Amino acid sequence: FAKADLLRDLVTAFNLTESHAARMAMDPVAVGHLLIDRGIEPIVQMTSRDKNRLAIQASILGAAALGVSNVVFMGGDPPKNGDHPDAKPVFDLFASQLLEAACALNNGTDLTGNALKGTPQLTIGAVANPGASDLETEIDNMKRKADAGAEFFQTQAIYDVGAFDQFMNKAKPERPVLGGIIPIKSVKMAQYMNDKIPGVDIPQALINKIDAAGDDKAKVADISIEIAGSTVRALGDITSGVHIMAIGWEDKIPAILDRASN
């Protein structure tokens, strides 16, 4: 919990992924409960990759019982891309159906209409990809998710603020949007993300800046922090906030936020 304690006075909440990239990790609901015990607000991700509709509803109710009230729903990464490639994917519900399930539980019934004894009080989130190859479909998906109960959105990583601004002007989302930030740790990482992660397009100009630092790790980190900080600053007038996916660089977040404010 050292990283959480380091950042607790700088951020509103901590995002907890559910076996991100299909790599096995502790259940985020359990981690979220432990953070709540430390006075830290969690945002828990839930996917349909590993659970059918019975298990998803049980997890939502379990999260609520443990005090977790912020949940972001998504499909999840296919198991074949993770560290357990033989795991069977479930994907019983689509993303909008996950939201409908959470909304139904919030309103006092399960997906089949059975009444609950008590109701959770969840703030329901969804994801959006402003770099999707088919923006019209992505915008339609955002509207569908909002209609299904999404109260806020988190986006894929943003590197071209101008293109993102155009997306927002076209989408005109009626829910708060948190722009995604992933610091560029290396040229290799940037190239991997451009090749493997749908919707991520790191401009060559940014890659060249990182490349110019050569093998000087401190200089690479400083350039990356400057890029991330300037992106956070630029998003200030476009989004309702940001979510920084530091991927092991959580100790760099204070510097990123400092650059963003200067």
Q: What is the meaning of each model-derived region?
A:
Residues 1-13, 145:
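Conserved N-terminal beta1-alpha1 strand-loop-helix module at the mouth
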